[in-house]
Curated annotation (Swiss-Prot):
Tissue expression remark: Expressed in lung and in primary lung squamous cell carcinoma (LSCC).
Keyword Transmembrane helix applies: yes
Subunit structure: Interacts with RTN4 (isoform B).
InterPro entries (alphabetical): GRAM, GRAMDC4, GRAMDC4_PH-GRAM, PH-like_dom_sf
Topological relation to the membrane, as annotated: Multi-pass membrane protein
Modification Phosphoserine, positions: S24, S28
Record's protein name: GRAM domain-containing protein 4
């Protein structure tokens, strides 16, 4: 480039004699050689005089040439920069495509599979070589002398031909089955776990619901038959079943029903519209999946699905734990009934013919399913007294119930020992309820003294230790009076709140259950998910409802307060009517 400028400077050609750089081919610096074709005009004496003049037009021509050259070089640099950016973008896109292609084809697993196949092939080749080597050694060891070999050559050829044909025929017939019985090492394949996704979790729950729908429909139809939802259908089913059992056709009847169900499913799969159900099916609205969800909607969706999964797993765990506790003699009086029934069935199967045993079992099952269960479902009190399977199932405990019973027994023992050690001088004429009410105490003292109540007022058994909460009195403006932390108790006639900060009883709150005008569940902070952890109680003396918030066992407390409130109000109403 400098040499080109030197040529321009020392030759001193005019502007028209230069090669226009803007019209030159777009090439790089390496492609441009020093020999640029220039027009060599004839110089006249006048031109030579102009060239000798340092301040003449030659200087202007050189300046304009340098500017044009710089401009073209700047354009070339911009063009090269653009090509470089395009190349980088193409490289980035190609890398993304390569990554997606690797994820789709799962090249790593294919490579591992290829390595395993190579190792297996090498092992097989080694085994084949060992077998061939052993055969050659055996042939060398069993090779007879030359005289005997010539004598028995024809017989051996015939025997070898016959044995080879026999081996070939045997391999063609049974070789595949022999290969199937060959032992191979078990391959431990590790399944890749999918990451947690709200959309995936919701879709799995919907799939589970759709998959369990045939089973739930079958159970609903059986329940409808037992409940005589359709009188004609239940009567026909009862008559057909009892006749089949009486004539010994119960098992063929069930097999025929299974074949009929599969035939109907085949026709439905072929496009036939066949809908038969005792209970009319209720079509649930299908919610279209939302593509764009906000963070709060995703969080609420995950909470809803987690709640459904929690309830489903809880029911399944209850069933499995009850079955386990039935067979593990957790409650001996219940398992003893099952034990005696199994012994009776065993002895009956040993001494009576199977036809008679099957007839008795089938008749009992039909009468129990169609008649006895119908009466028991219509009369719950009769069922609670005489339905043995129902009583056994309801009385079977789950593992959490066993833990609660054990903890309650331990606390009861501690209470009895403490009452014996600390209250030896209780009056003998008092009953158990009066004694418990008189000496029931909180952390700050006796219960009736703290709330200025009568001695027979004591907390109910459900809330003997109270529920921790915070009282929000929205009628007050001071922060100390607006929110108070403490414990909530429920007695037979009062709702008592004990403040945990002050020792004076002025900060405690006592509300008569009769004075309550409204009670409902309350959500203190609407931005948080869920149904809240508060209870709102309205009374005539307060302008705004009193809110007991931050209760962990909110539902239990609400049910207790509501049931006691209904009990007190109904008793007061009946007393007023009389």
């Amino acid at each position: 480039m400098l040499r080109r400028l030197d040529k321009i400077r020392f030759r001193g050609h005019k502007r028209d004699d230069f090669l226009d750089l803007a019209e030159s081919p777009n090439a790089s610096d390496t492609e441009c050689s020093d020999e640029i074709p220039l027009k060599v005009p004839r110089t006249s004496p006048r031109d030579s005089e102009e060239l000798r003049d340092p301040a003449g037009p030659g200087t202007l021509i050189m300046a304009t040439g340098v500017q044009d050259f710089n401009r073209t070089e700047f354009d070339r640099l911009n063009e090269i920069k653009g090509h470089l950016e395009i190349a980088l973008l193409e490289k980035h896109f190609l890398q993304e495509e390569l990554r997606k292609l690797r994820e789709e084809t799962n090249a790593e697993m294919l490579r591992q599979e290829l390595d395993r196949e190579r190792q297996r092939r090498m092992e097989l080749e080694q085994k084949v070589q060992e077998v061939l080597k052993a055969r050659t050694e055996e042939q060398m060891a069993q090779q007879p002398p030359k005289g005997q070999a010539q004598a028995s050559n024809g017989a051996e050829r015939r025997s070898q031909g016959l044995s080879s044909r026999l081996q070939k025929w045997f391999y063609e017939r049974f070789g595949e089955y022999v290969e199937d019985f060959r032992f191979q090492p078990e391959e431990n394949t590790v399944e890749t776990e999918e990451p947690l996704s709200a959309r995936r979790l919701t879709e799995n729950m919907r799939r589970l619901k759709r998959g369990a729908k045939p089973v739930t429909n079958f159970v609903k139809n059986l329940s409808a038959l037992s409940d005589w939802y359709s009188v004609y259908t239940s009567a026909i089913a009862f008559t057909v079943y009892m006749n089949a059992v009486w004539h010994g056709w119960a098992i063929p009847l069930f097999l025929f029903l299974a074949i009929l169900r599969l035939s109907l499913n085949y026709l439905i799969a072929r496009g036939w519209r066949i809908q038969w159900s005792i209970v009319p099916e209720v079509s649930e609205p299908v919610e279209p999946p939302k593509e764009d969800l906000t963070v709060s909607e995703k969080f609420q969706l995950v909470l809803d699905v987690a709640q459904k999964a929690q309830n489903l797993f809880g029911k399944m765990a209850d069933i499995l734990e009850k079955i386990k506790n039935l067979f593990m003699w957790v409650q001996p009086e219940i398992t003893q009934k099952l034990y005696v029934a199994l012994w009776a069935a065993f002895l009956a199967s040993c001494f009576f013919p199977y036809r008679l045993v099957g007839l008795a079992v089938g008749l009992y099952a039909g009468i129990k399913f169609f008649l006895i269960d119908f009466i028991f479902k219509r009369c719950p009190r009769l069922r609670a007294k005489y339905d043995t399977p129902y009583i056994i199932w309801r009385s079977l405990p789950t593992d959490p119930q066993l833990k609660e019973r054990s903890s309650a027994a331990v606390s009861r023992r501690l209470q009895t020992t403490s009452s014996r050690s600390y209250v030896p001088s209780a009056p003998a004429g008092l009953g158990k309820e009066e004694d418990a009410g008189r000496f029931h105490s909180t952390k700050k003292g006796n219960f009736h003294e703290i709330f200025n109540l009568t001695e027979n007022e004591r907390p109910l058994a459900v809330c003997e230790n109270g529920w921790r909460c915070c009282l929000i009195n929205r009628d007050r403006k001071m922060p100390t009076d607006y929110i108070r932390n403490g414990v909530l108790y429920v007695t037979e006639n009062y709702l008592c709140f004990e403040s945990s900060k002050s020792g004076s009883s002025k900060r405690n709150k006592v509300i008569k259950l009769v004075d309550i005008t409204d009670i409902q569940k309350y959500k203190v902070l609407s931005v948080l998910p869920g149904s809240g952890m508060g209870i709102a109680v309205s009374t005539p003396s307060t302008q705004k409802p009193l809110v007991f918030g931050a209760m962990v066992h909110r539902d239990e407390a609400f049910e207790t307060i509501l049931s006691q409130y209904i009990k007190i109000t109904s008793a007061a109403a009946s007393g007023g009517d009389s």
